């Protein structure tokens, strides 16, 4: 009798566990107008990258058309996209930043 209650408790515990929220990649997209140095500043300011890593990501964006800035929960990713786009517009650059499910 005790094992049946333990089994029911374990079953309930397993059913109530939630899976972690999906993560989203934040991507920068290449354009022909935004200066490379500005992209490096964005990567350092909003994604906490050191200059070397920011330069590598910037070159990936330049050569491959896009680069991953980081992977975050949905709300954090959306905030970062908004911040980057607003900062770029404030400095009159057309830099595009998007997010996609990881």
From Swiss-Prot:
Quaternary structure and partners: Binds to the N-terminal domain of the chaperone ClpA.
Pfam families for the chain: ClpS
Function: Involved in the modulation of the specificity of the ClpAP-mediated ATP-dependent protein degradation.
One of the GO BP terms on file: protein catabolic process
Gene3D superfamilies per UniProt: 3.30.1390.10
Family listed: Belongs to the ClpS family.
Protein name: ATP-dependent Clp protease adapter protein ClpS
Transmembrane segments: none
Family matches, as SUPFAM superfamilies: ClpS-like
NCBIfam families per record: PRK00033.1-5
HAMAP family with a match to the protein in the record: ClpS
InterPro entries hit by this protein: ClpS, ClpS_core, Ribosomal_bL12_C/ClpS-like
């Amino acid at each position: 009798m005790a094992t049946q209650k333990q089994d029911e408790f374990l079953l309930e515990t397993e059913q109530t566990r939630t899976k972690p929220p999906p993560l989203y990649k934040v991507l920068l997209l290449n354009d022909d107008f935004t200066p490379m140095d500005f992209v490096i500043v964005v990567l350092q300011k909003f994604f906490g990258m050191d200059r070397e890593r920011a330069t590598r990501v910037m070159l990936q964006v330049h050569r491959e058309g896009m680069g991953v800035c980081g992977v975050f929960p949905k709300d954090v990713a959306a905030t970062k996209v908004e911040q980057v786009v607003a900062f770029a517009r404030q400095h009159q650059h057309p830099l595009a930043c998007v997010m996609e499910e990881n």
